[in-house]
């Protein structure tokens, strides 16, 4: 079966579905790392964040794609130890899909919308407006590279995003 488009899961329509105790076979999250770069260095003077502007659900595949993109841009521009990046959301929400049979004779096999609760197909993170998704800490000279990396990460997410400077705004003006 093909993966459904993200627009099917983007909007928050029903109440949260997170109790894995009662679900059989929840697929694991594809997000592997939540902290990247120089984890020991806490003295980076500039911190910038990627903020979502609308309430939505972000699939774990989109979070992983955004993380990989931002990490690749930062490593290429600042080096492996020139930044610290943190992914600040976790995909708790379990996404379901009511599989539909297609093709010849599907009407005999399929039950349509009867028992349409669906099977678990993935996980997603529910975010609120103005919630931080990624935070990047860098040196002053690497500010533009970090901003560009967050912009590229925002392009992978299903909601409009904005980049804000958390610390060190006076250094980068």
UniProtKB/Swiss-Prot annotation:
Organism listed in the record: Methanosarcina acetivorans (strain ATCC 35395 / DSM 2834 / JCM 12185 / C2A)
UniProt KW keywords: Ribonucleoprotein, Ribosomal protein
MF (Gene Ontology): structural constituent of ribosome
Lineage of the species this protein comes from: Archaea, Methanobacteriati, Methanobacteriota, Stenosarchaea group, Methanomicrobia
InterPro entries according to UniProt: Ribosomal_uL16, Ribosomal_uL16_arc, Ribosomal_uL16_CS_euk_arc, Ribosomal_uL16_dom, Ribosomal_uL16_euk_arch, Ribosomal_uL16_sf
Keyword Lipid metabolism belongs to the record: no
Superkingdom of source: Archaea
Record-level GO cellular component terms: cytosolic large ribosomal subunit
UniProt-recorded name of the protein: Large ribosomal subunit protein uL16
Gene3D superfamilies reported for this sequence: Ribosomal protein L10e/L16
Biological process according to GO: translation
CDD domains cross-referenced by the UniProt entry: Ribosomal_L16_L10e
Listed Pfam families: Ribosomal_L16
């Amino acid at each position: 079966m093909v993966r459904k488009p993200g627009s099917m899961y983007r909007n928050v329509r029903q109440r949260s579905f997170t109790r894995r105790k009662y679900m059989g076979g929840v697929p694991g999250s594809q997000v592997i790392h939540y902290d990247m770069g120089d984890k020991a260095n806490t003295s980076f003077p500039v911190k910038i964040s990627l903020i979502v502007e609308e309430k939505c659900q972000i699939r774990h595949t989109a979070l992983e794609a955004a993380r990989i993109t931002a990490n690749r841009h930062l490593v290429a521009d600042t080096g492996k130890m020139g930044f610290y990046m943190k992914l600040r959301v976790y995909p708790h929400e379990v996404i379901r899909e009511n599989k539909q049979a297609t093709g010849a004779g599907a009407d005999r096999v399929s039950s349509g919308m009867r028992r349409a609760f669906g099977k678990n197909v993935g996980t997603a993170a529910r975010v609120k407006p103005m919630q931080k998704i990624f935070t990047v800490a860098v040196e002053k000279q690497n500010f533009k590279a970090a901003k560009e990396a967050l912009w590229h990460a925002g392009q992978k997410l299903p909601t409009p995003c904005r980049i804000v400077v958390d610390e060190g705004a006076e250094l980068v003006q």
